[in-house]
Amino acid sequence: MNNNIINLIAAIILSLSIIFGWQYFVVKPEQKKQQQQIAVQKAENLKKQQLKAVVEPATGIVVQEESQVQRIKIESESLTGSISLKGLRFDDLILKKYKQDLSKNSPEVRLFSPANTENAYFAEVGLVSNLSSVKLPNNDTIWNSDSEILSPEKPVHLFWVNEDGVKFLVTITVDENYLFTIEQTIVNNSDKELPVQSYGLINRKYIAVEKAVNILHQGPIGCIDENLKEYSYDDIKDKKSEKFVASKVDWIGITDKYWLSSLIPDKSSNYSSNFNYALKQGTERYQVDFISPVQIIKPGEDFSIKSRIFAGAKKVDLLDKYEKQYDIKLFDRAIDFGWFYIITKPVFYAMNFFYGYVGNFGVSILIVTVIIKLLMFTLANKSYRSMKKMKNLQPEIDRIKNLYSDDKARLNQEIMALYKKEKVNPVAGCLPILVQIPVFFSIYKVLYVTIEMRQAPFYGWIKDLSASDPTTIFNLFGLLPFSPPLFLMIGAWPILMAITMFLQQKMSPEPADPMQAQVMKFMPLIFLFMFSSFPVGLLIYWSWNNILSIIQQYYINKFN
């Protein structure tokens, strides 16, 4: 095997080693450090006093003093919580279908919390005016409601009348999932023109979160002028504000690993939008907001505008549905499928399709792996044949190297002539590896970022395919009463992966180059430690892929 091929393989191995090494030695310790920071921050937050309102809506960060005001209760199949009638704020929302962890008494996931709470996070829509003389509903307005409960079967109608007789009507509906629709109507019963602008905002108190560096996006996000905009919390903190003027805003919001809160404005006009950061009384806050152009409402006329709020789990089929139903461009990209989006999403679709039949995502992974293996069988067959031919040609290649050791150009010319004569492709042996790399990372992404894989069980001790194997050989898989350090958490599935990788190597043609052969012998051991902290679903895929490769190699050896 010539130096170019050796360098190619070495580059692939080095790249994988850097990526997995970064995950193992940097990301995991960083996550542990951040978990400690979260605990410290929570303790400090308990000592802080409640915050009062400091900034006007839609112009910056909004913090409102919470008081005992009337609320509209939210009840649906997916959500519970309430909407504050003071300022019409969505600030109390719990996701009924998701628990915080796998413990028996785990509470449900809370998404929104009132402004003065420890994890303040809320959304609101409303109206502002460039004239101070125009009396509009604001953060202190107490709305009147025709109902105390909002449900998919029962919309809520709100109203408020200012001192000039201008009537403001709001109709709120919620579907069975996570989408609120808010229709605002202004009936100008006064004798003056009303210049108004509609706005929407999502405001969040920053809390240290677990970050998987360069693996997924968390923070402000949106689709503006049909382009996906992603900003980390640090980006916005450094810039203080990122502004877009008179732009087409399909949606803007704040995303977590599994959860999304998003504003979806009316498509009737362009909007100015902002991604903001502010530090108030020692508290960091982030806000995304939009504001419409000025709309003049003449006396005796009325004006209506509709906007939506998505607040919930980032389910792939749900985001796809809303994207198609309401023409919300790139809404599915709120899920960070990564560089291999065109592969990752079809891989998820395939897994989800088979899950519909077998009811287990682990089994679905096994089925998809078989299909991928069958699709790649012809390529693998050619690859194994090429590797075998390369090994048989090695003595002749060595002879040519000795003969033309002082003439590099002639050496390469003679070797290429030999390849052509024997009909050997020197890179054919690398093709299955190169093809598997995007498939591998696609499955990793699916396991890591999709809500469908969160807390999805397999069989036996595997209760969450998106988490690492909870067992370790260093306490005899739980028989000994102690927990080894993180770097010794080498469970049954990482060991099975390493064993199957070793057996696969034994059945495959040994690389012709002695140095490469020595490197390959150590790969199962290296991968054992690197993969031990990865999602166990990925290890199930890799182990099963190795087993199928062993069967495939047996077939090729027998019939070729």
UniProtKB/Swiss-Prot annotation:
The chain crosses the membrane at residues 5-25, 334-354, 357-377, 431-451, 476-496, 522-542. The keyword Transmembrane applies. It is found in: Cell inner membrane. The keyword Mitochondrion does not apply. Keywords: Cell inner membrane, Cell membrane, Chaperone, Membrane, Protein transport, Transmembrane, Transmembrane helix, Transport. One of its GO terms (cellular component) is plasma membrane. It is a multi-pass membrane protein. Pfam families: 60KD_IMP, YidC_periplas. GO terms for biological process: protein insertion into membrane; protein transport. GO terms for molecular function: membrane insertase activity. Interacts with the Sec translocase complex via SecD. Specifically interacts with transmembrane segments of nascent integral membrane proteins during membrane integration. PANTHER family: CYTOCHROME C OXIDASE ASSEMBLY PROTEIN COX18, MITOCHONDRIAL, OXA1. Required for the insertion and/or proper folding and/or complex formation of integral membrane proteins into the membrane. Involved in integration of membrane proteins that insert both dependently and independently of the Sec translocase complex, as well as at least some lipoproteins. Aids folding of multispanning membrane proteins. HAMAP family: YidC_type1. Belongs to the OXA1/ALB3/YidC family. Type 1 subfamily. This is Membrane protein insertase YidC. It comes from Rickettsia africae (strain ESF-5).
